[in-house]
Amino acid sequence: MGNADLRSLAALSDVSFDDLGGSVVAVDAHNWLYRYLTTTVKFTSESKYTTSNGEEVANLIGVVQGLPKFFEHDMTPVFVFDGAVTDLKDDEVEKRREQRQKYESELEAAREAGDSTRVAKLDSRTQRLTDTIVDTTRDLLELLDVPIVDAPAEGEGQASVMARRGDVDYVGTEDYDALLFGAPMTLRQITSKGDPELMDFAATLEHHDLTWEQLVDAAILMGTDFNEGISGIGPKTAVKDLHEHGDLYTVLAARGEHIDHADRIRDLFLDPAATDDYEIPDSIEPDIDAARTFVTDQWEVDADEVARGFERIDDSVVQTGLDRWA
């Protein structure tokens, strides 16, 4: 999920969706889905996001509600899905699993007590991306002709490499780790109602007089998904130490500290596993009727819940009048 402390280092500015027309955005699919599941559609009534068999379908509502924003502004979304979990992340994954189990126990108790406020809060904390959520999301995206890329490891790393190659214009994610992966321009808050926030990699480095390697070193000192940080080191101290000592290893030596697998963690950000097995299409032709049938008939989503979203997708295909949208 990244280190939120990076926000204080990031060069951020507001940008209007109206200024993003014609751009291609590599969306961190798991991050995008998680945001919708925990903040956007998770708080509708339970009957609207589960089937009669108890299968969760909030992700499908999220896709139908979230894609129009791209289409209406003539933006091409490319959804990048995570691959294998890096072994260095195993401890973090286990920690989150244990925390989720704790919340699930508390959630059950809150339900038994009839505490709806507590239930709503804990419901989002117990959210996880099941195989069904991922598979049905992919199926719906394919029906809507939205490009999909399968990353060999971190989806965010793959998206950032695509941006550095010039194959896409932006990375779309809430995580600040996109900076560490070297994404030139990142759009945050793309699931929010308003305009997104632009995170500028080059401006971040320039503002703090850091190299890319030093920015990664700063993050490692603070702590990443792959390691615990050094106690007492936040953004300001990390930058100060790097200006004084030059790199991660010299800082650690000066402080008498050690971080396991520091070389590997650096490489995970500076040279992430990535594939070139993808295509960015010149045109997208969503099969809206098939997508609607998939969502409402096969997965039992209330037709009224997604009617406006499909209408907006249909309208945007007509209104753009450009080759990208057939």
From Swiss-Prot:
GO terms for biological process: DNA repair; DNA replication, removal of RNA primer. It is an enzyme of class 3 (hydrolase). Its cofactor is Mg(2+). Mg(2+) 1 binds at D28, D82, E154, E156. GO terms for molecular function: 5'-3' exonuclease activity; 5'-flap endonuclease activity; DNA binding; magnesium ion binding. Keywords: DNA damage, DNA repair, DNA replication, Endonuclease, Exonuclease, Hydrolase, Magnesium, Metal-binding, Nuclease. Its EC number is 3.1.-.-. Residues 118-246 are annotated as: I-domain. Mg(2+) 2 binds at D175, D177, D225. Residues 318-326 are annotated as: Interaction with PCNA. Interacts with PCNA. PCNA stimulates the nuclease activity without altering cleavage specificity. Belongs to the XPG/RAD2 endonuclease family. FEN1 subfamily. This is Flap endonuclease 1. It comes from Haloarcula marismortui (strain ATCC 43049 / DSM 3752 / JCM 8966 / VKM B-1809). The gene is fen.
